[in-house]
């Protein structure tokens, strides 16, 4: 039940994030039926059951909101193999590719994505971050920092 609620929340956040970028057509293509298509970059810090569940729950939440891989969504999943330098390279690549959104899984990937996307209009969502304030992903009052 907890995972399902998390997936729905993440899906709603994703939908709102994509809607906020709706005026820009960069990186978007049309699917066969004329519906907009999106590309999401998922940066996962390491292979781990809990982190895998976060990724799967995120994608399930999107599907429940009508954003489905193979239909109107392209997903690029990359794993940093527990290396912060690799996490930074992954995030830089997503920004360079102008994905529509970056989903970062675990604190080091979230920090890398935040720093890479800081001067872009690419929204960043994250999961599996224990303390967003300490990670400098949120302000002291809990509001997001930048485009996170």
Where do the model's predicted regions map?
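Positively charged n-region of N-terminal signal peptides that target proteins for export
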Residues: 1-13
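C-terminal motif of bacterial Sec signal peptides marking the signal peptidase cleavage site
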Residues: 16-20
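Short hydrophobic alpha-helices and adjacent helix-cap/hinge residues
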Residues: 4, 22-148
